[in-house]
Amino acid sequence: MALSNLKSNRTLSSSLITIFIISLFLQYHNIKSQSSWQSRQVPRSETVAFSITEFEKENPDIFLRGDTSISDGILRLTKTDQSGKPLPNTVGRATYLTPIHIWDKTSGELADFSTSFSFIVNTNDSDLHGDGFAFYLGPLHFDVPKNSSGGYLGLFDPENAFPPSKTPILAIEFDGFTNEWDPPSSFQSPHIGIDVGSIVSLEYAQWPINFVPRNALGEANINYNSESKRLSVFVAYPGTQWNSTRVSVVVDLRSVLPEWVRIGFSATTGELVETHDIINWSFESAL
C-alpha cells in the first residue's frame, strides 16, 4: 500500500510539474503575442527603418488607395491595361502605415531622414505625357483629395494647392507635364521639384525623362539634415549619358508638417498618360 501511494504521489507531482511548465510556456507565448499585437497597433518609434527589395501583394505595412496595385513585385501607382499601356485620368497612392516622428514638440528637435527608391516611368516614346508622381510626407490621416487628378498629383485639390494656402505636405515631385503653375522655361519641363505646402515647386531642376531610353531605370536619393535643415534630392539614370539631377532647399519641417507623419507615393495621369512604377524602396529616420 505504501509503495502504491508513493508511486501515485510521484505521478501526481510529475503531472503538476508538467502542467506548471506548460502553463509557463503558454503564458510566455501569450505575453509575446500580446506585445507583438500591441506594437503593431501603435507602431510609433523615434527611429524607423525598412528596405523593400520587392513589393508583396499582402504586405501589411503598405496601404494602397485609388488605382495603385502590386504585380510582379512592382508597385504600380497608376492604372494600366492588360498589355501594360497606361490609362488616362487615374489617381493612386501607396502609404507606409508606421507613423514617422519627424520633430518633437517638447524638445524642438528635428529628425534626420533619408530614402531611396528605383522607378520606371514609361512615356510610350511621346514628348507629351503626364502627369507625374511624388514621394511625400503628410498628416497621419491624409485622404486622397477630390479633384486631385492630373497636375495635382493626388496630393492637392484646386482650393488648397496654391499659396498663400499651406497644406501640411512636403513632396518631391517628378512632373512630366507643364501646368500653368509649373516652371515657365522649357528647359525645366519636365522637372523634379520640391513642394513645400503647395503644388508650386519651391525649387526645381530638369528631369531628363524625355531623353533617356524607354523603360530606363531611375534612382532617387532624398536626404534631410536636421542641423542644416537642408533637403537634398539626387536623381540618376545609371547606364545612360545623363548625369545626376540635383535639387535642394532649406526648410524647417516644424513650420510645415505635424509632429507625426506618414510617408508614401502618389501619382496621377490626366488626358495624357505615362506609367509610374516603383521597383524598390528603402527609408530610415532618427529623431
Curated annotation (Swiss-Prot):
GO terms for biological process: response to symbiotic fungus. Coiled coil: none annotated. Residues 1-11 are cytoplasmic. Keywords: Glycoprotein, Lectin, Membrane, Transmembrane, Transmembrane helix. It comes from the Eukaryota. This is Lectin 10. GO terms for cellular component: membrane. The chain crosses the membrane at residues 12-31. Belongs to the leguminous lectin family. Glycans are attached at N124, N147, N243, N280. GO terms for molecular function: carbohydrate binding. PROSITE patterns: LECTIN_LEGUME_ALPHA. Signal peptide: none annotated. May be involved in arbuscular mycorrhizal (AM) symbiosis with AM fungi. Its main location: membrane. Induction: Accumulates in roots during colonization by arbuscular mycorrhizal (AM) fungi (e.g. Glomus intraradices). It is a single-pass membrane protein.
